[in-house]
């Protein structure tokens, strides 16, 4: 019975949902942008030939996190496009090679601490340059264009106005989404900020789901005193205000993305526990569960292999809202000025829309739109998964 919901045309039924194509398209854009950010938005050229010698300046600026996202994209591509041909041995081989590459990157990569972006811009006028390949957006997220003079808060497609900007020995710069208050390109920062949105949403929700499924499954399966104790624990955690707890930790321990993810995860599991408990209370009386118990199947297998797949429908909807809530929580902190300082964030950029005497519409439209569409697409996916797995909807459609 469990295989019916996890393997039987699940993907085809999910894709048939309303708006799923748009949701997958948007999330795909976010994944590609997050994983290939250094190659999509970078002041340093990707490749140059100077005096018949090849150089890769952009690779000088790569950090460990950049390698992590690149390897993640490669793994996703392999497991998606070759899913029908992958066996267990090949999977372990791919994961082992990926782990080895990450270990080597962590040991040997030593990125530059102080970056002179003007040096990379001047390469364009170097007489020794024979060939150059630049990133589509030739501005890094922390490139504040100091060599151009005062470049703060320029609207999209604005032309340079100050004498220093006009007379500088460089081609006219174009910012499709404008610049922020520090002069950094907004589109470049949005591309790099997609990493925080995806990371905090997925990891925080995964932590919450793992805790909630384990506790909720035990509550629903055993019931009695364990159920009562678990419900009291759920009520305690539901009374904890996540946002105020985040503010407290930021005040005492500084601005740390990993602490944010853990706090959001350990304060958001109660909803998953309630859903899992309700489903397991119903499923534990089913004949196939009783047969599994009589057969002597281990408890772990009964709970998570036979019962969980048949009670996962409410969790998928809750998961979509959980990812959205985690993204909104981080955006709220950044909007309040308590997010990460150096790393770009959508909430941080949204704050700059009203952070001066005038309303900077581009700082509200583009980061705010990114937050809205990301939250909206996760909601669409959750609803589509619910409809694809729900046996009542399947019976009605048939």
Where are these regions (language model features)?
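Alpha-helical transmembrane segments of integral membrane proteins
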Residues: 179-398
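Gly/Trp-centered helix-boundary motif
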Residues: 1-209, 213, 353-368, 372-377, ...
């Amino acid at each position: 019975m469990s295989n019916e919901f996890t393997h039987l045309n699940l993907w085809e039924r999910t894709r048939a949902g309303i708006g799923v194509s748009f949701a997958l398209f948007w999330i795909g854009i976010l994944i590609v942008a997050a994983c290939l950010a250094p190659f999509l938005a970078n002041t340093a050229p990707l490749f140059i030939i100077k005096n018949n010698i090849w150089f890769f300046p952009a690779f000088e600026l790569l950090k460990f996190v950049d390698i992590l996202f690149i390897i993640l994209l490669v793994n996703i591509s392999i497991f998606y496009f070759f899913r029908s041909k992958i066996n267990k041995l090949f999977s372990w081989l791919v994961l082992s090679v990926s782990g080895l590459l990450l270990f080597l990157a962590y040991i040997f990569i030593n990125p530059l601490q102080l970056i002179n972006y003007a040096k990379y811009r001047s390469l364009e006028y170097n007489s020794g340059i024979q060939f150059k390949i630049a990133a589509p957006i030739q501005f890094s997220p922390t490139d504040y264009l100091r060599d151009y003079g005062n470049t703060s808060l320029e609207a999209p497609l604005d032309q340079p106005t100050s004498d220093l900007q006009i007379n500088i020995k460089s081609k006219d710069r174009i910012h499709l989404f404008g610049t922020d208050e520090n002069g950094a390109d907004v589109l470049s920062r949005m591309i790099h900020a997609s990493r925080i949105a995806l990371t905090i949403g997925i990891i925080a929700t995964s932590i919450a789901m793992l805790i909630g499924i384990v506790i909720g499954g035990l509550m629903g399966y055993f019931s009695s005193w364990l159920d009562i104790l678990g419900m009291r624990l759920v009520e305690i955690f539901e009374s904890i205000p996540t946002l105020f707890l985040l503010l407290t930790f930021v005040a005492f321990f500084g601005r740390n993305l990993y602490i944010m993810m853990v706090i959001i995860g350990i304060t958001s599991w109660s909803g998953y526990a309630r859903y899992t408990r309700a489903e397991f209370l119903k499923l534990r009386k089913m004949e196939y569960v009783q047969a599994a118990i009589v057969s002597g199947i281990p408890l772990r297998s009964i709970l998570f292999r036979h019962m969980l797949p048949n009670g996962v429908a409410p969790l998928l909807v809750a998961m979509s809202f959980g990812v959205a809530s985690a993204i909104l929580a981080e955006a709220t902190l950044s909007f309040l000025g308590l997010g990460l300082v150096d790393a770009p964030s959508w909430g941080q950029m949204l704050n700059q829309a009203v952070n001066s005497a005038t309303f900077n519409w581009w700082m509200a439209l583009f980061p705010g739109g990114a937050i809205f569409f990301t939250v909206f697409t996760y909601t669409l996916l959750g609803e589509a998964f619910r409809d694809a797995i729900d046996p009542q909807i399947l019976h009605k459609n048939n």
